[in-house]
Amino acid sequence: MAFRLVLASQSPRRRELLDQLGVAHEVRPANTDESVHPGEPARAYVLRVAREKARAVEGELVLAADTAVVLRGEVLGKPRDAEDARRMLAALSGTAHEVLTGVCVRRRPGRGSAVELDAVVSTAVRFAPLGPAEISWYVATGEPLDKAGAYAIQGVGGAFVLGVEGSVSNVVGLPLAETAELLRRAGHPLPWDAPGGPAQGGGAP
């Protein structure tokens, strides 16, 4: 039996990515503290926050995620303000960095015990060198202000990305392949699992 999926996020990017999967869902944003604990490793941080988001929302099947940009061990979340966004972009300029997303699927059928399935996905991103004028212009667009690491690969910020190694959807905010696998393991069928779904192989009849 498939449960109605609840997305514990207000991110429009995650909603759009779930729509790409063809997975019906409703949105119930989680209100959790996303601060990094002192000395907390980046992988532990994104996984902890994803789990806390999943636990903060009611539902029989809840999906939550948290994304962070990591540069030389520093976790870059969403910038506090425009000045913080400029600082992040200047630090990322001309470097390679890591994007981590923690994903948690929490299933709690009826009054039964909850089961959590989770994963952390890593993508390497190479950034172009950016001058002060480019950074100021980009920050003035407003795009960086609600994005981890102060850029959006699916937006104007994609012009600054020289290369990506790994999942691109992970950089946007939700790694699709890994999320699909977690949903399947939680007992939630995917559109192509259903009888009469897309044919396997893709060959001509």
Curated annotation (Swiss-Prot):
It holds the Pfam family Maf. GO terms for biological process: nucleotide metabolic process. InterPro entries: ITPase-like_fam (IPR029001), Maf-like (IPR003697). One of its GO terms (cellular component) is cytoplasm. Keywords: Cytoplasm, Hydrolase, Nucleotide metabolism. The active site is at D66. Its cofactor is a divalent metal cation. It catalyses: dTTP + H2O = dTMP + diphosphate + H(+); UTP + H2O = UMP + diphosphate + H(+). It is found in: Cytoplasm. Its EC number is 3.6.1.9. The record marks R13, T67, Q154 as: Important for substrate specificity. One of its GO terms (molecular function) is dTTP diphosphatase activity. Gene3D superfamilies: 3.90.950.10. Nucleoside triphosphate pyrophosphatase that hydrolyzes dTTP and UTP. May have a dual role in cell division arrest and in preventing the incorporation of modified nucleotides into cellular nucleic acids. HAMAP family: Maf. Belongs to the Maf family. YhdE subfamily. NCBIfam families: maf. This is dTTP/UTP pyrophosphatase. It comes from Anaeromyxobacter sp. (strain Fw109-5).
